[in-house]
């Protein structure tokens, strides 16, 4: 028997602990919309990953709930590495340099976005707001601390151990999947659109 922590398939063939990816991106995008942003871009992960697809659904859902148009050309695919965040930001600026906010599907790519904007003299959040996803260690230490979506890693680890012990003690148990909820961590990389120049 196996135990997976991430990217479980829709039909679970093992015990698993997974993040509600859709809710995470929904919270990130809703935060930007509540700050008055409408021209919001997005850098995703690889399209074949279940986590990416869930996050895209959450991104779009936030627009749909408010009856807002979401421009498909402002969704750019990345690969969860820093350099793809840099390249993705360049692509988005080439498509529409008037964007006011960007949701990046992980913090590593957000670091690349920060570097791109720094190289181009674009100030965060005074000119563009940025929201990441994962809340990894260095995100709070960037030159502008990153607003992001936090994953309850310790809870996930504890739940995974709990499921594994129960599986060892009773191999006849049906497969179980525990879905954990992410939360929005607001730092300094987002601001109200009225404050932006």
Model regions: which residues?
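Hinge/beta->alpha junction and helix N-cap segments in small-molecule ligand-binding domains
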Residues: 16-27, 43-88, 103-111, 133-135, ...
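Non-catalytic positions within long, well-ordered alpha-helices that form the structural scaffold/packing
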Residues: 33-36
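Rossmann-fold NAD(P)-dependent oxidoreductase module
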Residues: 31, 62, 116
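Short, small-residue-biased leader/transition segments that mark boundaries at the very start
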Residues: 1-9
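A short acidic, helix-capping loop that chelates divalent metal ions and anchors anionic groups
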Residues: 11-15, 139-140
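Short acidic capping loops at alpha-helix termini that bridge into adjacent secondary structure
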Residues: 38-39, 70-74, 123-130
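Flexible loop/turn connectors
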Residues: 90-91, 95-197
